[in-house]
Amino acid sequence: MIAIVDDDDSLRTAVQDLLEAVGLPAQGFASAEEFLNSGKQHGTACLIADIRMPGMSGLELQAHLNAERCRVPIIFITAHGDEKMRLQARREGAVEFLSKPFDNEVLLDSVRAALES
């Protein structure tokens, strides 16, 4: 299952629909806390997460998963990223960092690469 964690309902739904249209099972979560409370982090094959969200940020979610030794490939998407943020995410193990708006094919290629890693 590919988890999509983003507080933007329309983007989360669009990404879920895109993944499911190419046969990839996906589930959306409105916040990092909702994702963690679902108990599905250890059954997640790939995580697509926004960096900036109310409550726990995407980077804080990444740190939490790393502390739990939950090594899920993470693709970050953000409208407000900078180079420092990108480097921090990569240093902590993110496989990709995409700026919004992103090309659907680039996202799909990133997901496929993450699933193969």
Residue ranges, per PLM feature:
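Receiver (REC) domain active-site loop signature in two-component systems and cognate sites
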Residues: 53
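Alpha4 helix (beta4-alpha4-beta5 surface) of REC/receiver domains from two-component response regulators
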Residues: 60, 81-96
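Active-site beta3 strand of CheY-like receiver
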Residues: 42-48
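C-terminal output helix
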Residues: 84, 102-112
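Acidic catalytic/metal-coordinating carboxylates
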Residues: 30-31, 57-60
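Two-component/phosphorelay signaling modules centered on CheY-like receiver
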Residues: 9-27, 114
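Active-site residues of response regulator receiver
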Residues: 50, 78
